Amino acid sequence: MLKTSIAALSVLAFSFHAALAQPLASISDVSQPQRFTQWVQSRCIVSIADSAALKADANASAAAWLEASELPVEAFNAADAVIAQALKTRVGGTAKTDYRVLKCALIAQSADVQALYQQFARQKAQ
């Protein structure tokens, strides 16, 4: 009985590990709206980064999302302004912190960012 249980747990653990070991999706598998959202989040992280390494990595990530986007550069310039303004907004919680990463996630998912995407996607379609 013990051997059977151990064998079953081993198979389960191996299966779980194999599922976690799947490669990440390619940027090309991500939708255009989500590419813009991810760019916004990466650019926001550039603004809040307190280390040169994180800032450089976030800039490189933003560049990758920008290269994969079909939106005009003006969309990204407008989004930078939205990010700068939204970062001034206070976000509260139970911990005594600035919630900077949370702000970036919320900014990326905000109605303002979604509206920018829609505006520039419509212009591109015309």
Question: Could you say what each language-model-derived stretch is?
Answer:
Residues M1-L9:
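Bacterial N-terminal signal peptides that target proteins for export
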Residues K3, L24-S28, R90-T94:
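Low-complexity, polar-biased intrinsically disordered regions enriched in Pro/Ser/Thr/Gly
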Residues S15, F36-Q38, D98:
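Processing junctions and N-termini across compartments
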Residues F16-A21:
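Sec/Tat signal peptide C-region and signal peptidase I cleavage site
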Residues Q22-A68:
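N-terminal secretory signal peptides
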Residues L54-Q126:
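Compact alpha-helical subdomains of small soluble proteins
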